[in-house]
Amino acid sequence: MVRLYFLKIGYAIINLCIKRFGVNYMGEIRSNPDELLRAIKNEDSYHKRGHLKIFFGYAAGVGKTYAMLKAAHAAKRRGIDVVVGYVEPHPRPRTAALLKGLEILPNKQIPYHNIVLKEFDLDAVIKRKPQLVIVDELAHTNAEGCRHEKRYQDVEELLKAGIDVYTTVNVQHIESLNDMVASITGITVRERIPDRVFDNADQVELVDIEPEDLIERLHAGQIYLDTQAQKALTNFFSIENLTA
């Protein structure tokens, strides 16, 4: 059973999540029951629309992407047509290893000054039309030249096209919880998703580890590179913030 540790950012946050969304016995936060009932009443539109599963955590490095990719392999074993649309590149060998055996679509290349940015290629996924696509970092802001400003808008278009989506997001990126997390950690996150995106998810899986284990991963270079890791340790990833 998944343990609900969210002591790291205060019991107030997890209690609010439970109150708003409900938690089943597997530790998965469910969508608002009224929202699901309304969708089920219109079976045609419900079955044509893609389903959204969010892997939900309290910080980078807790294992959201790892859990998402393991779930992708499980879906593939069940005969589901799965592709990887975008996975954030990080120095995490165990996570990178899980990309093996999955079809990976090329990123969209966007020239920006003297560099080339790599973004999720929405059109490539719609053209390929898999049953399930993996799209990391739901709160990401797209580069200029993409059809939508935010990645969650890309995901909404995929769902409307009847494609299921697995994605990841941290608690501080949810609009209504952002200020609460900022008051606990002292850090404001600019990239946010509207509550409705989270509310309308068909399934939300909590991914969590002890704060000491997370800091150990950070020290070991399993989350960020050295310079980023040191900065993170003195900001969001301080033990005071993670155990607040």
Model-derived features: positions:
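Conserved P-loop
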Residues: 51-120, 127
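Pre-Walker A adenine-sensing motif
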Residues: 35-47
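Conserved ATPase-coupling elements of RecA-like P-loop NTPase cores
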Residues: 137-151, 177-179
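Loop/turn-to-beta-strand initiation segments
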Residues: 81, 129-132, 161-166
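C-terminal accessory "lid"/substrate-recognition subdomains
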Residues: 196-199, 203-244
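Conserved nucleotide-binding/hydrolysis micro-motifs of P-loop NTPases
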Residues: 88-93, 139-140, 165, 171-176, ...
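Short, positively charged and aromatic/hydrophobic N-terminal segments
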Residues: 8-24
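A short alpha->loop->secondary-structure connector
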Residues: 148-152, 181-196, 222-226
